[in-house]
UniProtKB/Swiss-Prot annotation:
Gene Ontology cellular component annotations, sorted alphabetically: plasma membrane
Residue stretches in coiled coil: none
Function summary: Component of the high affinity leucine, isoleucine, valine, transport system (LIV-I), which is operative without Na(+) and is specific for alanine and threonine, in addition to branched-chain amino acids.
Alphabetical UniProt keywords: Amino-acid transport, ATP-binding, Cell inner membrane, Cell membrane, Membrane, Nucleotide-binding, Transport
Family affiliation: Belongs to the ABC transporter superfamily.
Name of the molecule in the record: High-affinity branched-chain amino acid transport ATP-binding protein BraG
PANTHER family: HIGH-AFFINITY BRANCHED-CHAIN AMINO ACID TRANSPORT ATP-BINDING PROTEIN LIVF
Positions bound to ATP: 34-41
CDD domains cross-referenced by the UniProt entry: ABC_TM1139_LivF_branched (cd03224)
Compartments, as annotated in UniProt: Cell inner membrane
Domain ABC transporter: start-end pairs: 2-233
GO MF annotation: an example: ATP binding
Lineage, broadest ranks: Bacteria, Pseudomonadati, Pseudomonadota, Gammaproteobacteria, Pseudomonadales
InterPro entries on file: AAA+_ATPase, ABC_branched_ATPase_LivF/BraG, ABC_transporter-like_ATP-bd, ABC_transporter-like_CS, BCAA_Transport_ATP-bd_LivF, P-loop_NTPase
Length: 233
């Protein structure tokens, strides 16, 4: 469904990604783990077209994405939940969700809204509340709900557990698993390696802009090198 083939990305003269190859198959949850500054978010941003890959290929459902503007890429049934949530703080929950569904067909809009509110009952309770007055966990639910309003086939999640309480993190990961059961393919970028690897079908480890390991989530969870580096031994 999605493949990166020897992708390299630069910020000016600084190379952030070095010949990165990653594959996400339809119906999978694939996670990318790594330390701060490893290049995880850069890989997602490169997929979205900003920055553009300097070399290599990124294909989604057989179509080459490198060279396309971000506005075109994001109309291809791909949705992103950015790091830090980035909800529209002065808009209500309803208005935030409406922004996510801006390009959704009129016939599908209310169906999708109902699905999101069923998935996140808390958003239904806070429907008329301004997003900026909500807790971090509620804002993360809203950010995911907003992304789902576009009816994506592929959902990109950038550090969804960042800054959240453990009980909320567990809820978020349960929702990600539920989305997979409903047919959404998930590419998860996450520092919380323990949770991410438990959830993932397959996983990649990124260090200094390079893929250094790739295996099933279960295998990496028990890998001594991964445990020492990312799971506290």
């Amino acid at each position: 469904m999605l493949s990166f083939d020897k992708v390299s990305t630069y910020y000016g003269k600084i190379q952030a990604l070095h010949d990165v190859s990653v594959e996400v198959k339809k119906g999978e949850i694939v996670t990318l783990i790594g330390a701060n500054g490893a290049g995880k978010s850069t890989l997602l941003m490169t997929l979205c077209g900003s920055p553009q890959a300097a070399s290599g290929s990124i294909r989604y459902e057989g179509e080459e994405l490198v060279g396309l503007p971000s506005s075109t890429i994001m109309r291809k049934s791909i949705a992103v939940v950015p790091e830090g949530r980035r909800v529209f703080s002065r808009l209500t929950v309803e208005e935030n969700l409406a922004m996510g569904g801006f390009f959704t067909d009129k016939d599908d809009y209310q169906v999708q809204m109902d699905k999101v509110l069923e998935l996140f009952p808390r958003l239904k309770e806070r429907y008329e509340q301004r997003a900026g007055t909500m807790s971090g966990g509620e804002q993360q639910m809203l950010a995911i709900g907003r992304a789902l309003m576009s009816k994506p086939k592929l959902l990109l999640l950038d550090e969804p557990s960042l800054g959240l309480a453990p009980i909320i993190i567990q809820q978020i990961f349960e929702i990600i698993e539920q989305l997979r059961r409903e047919g959404v393919t998930v590419f998860l970028v996450e520092q919380n390696a323990n949770q991410a690897l438990k959830l993932a079908d397959r996983a990649y480890v990124l260090e200094n802009g390079r893929i250094v390991m790739h295996d099933t989530g279960a295998a990496l969870l028990t890998n001594p090198k991964v445990r020492d580096a990312y799971l506290g031994g």
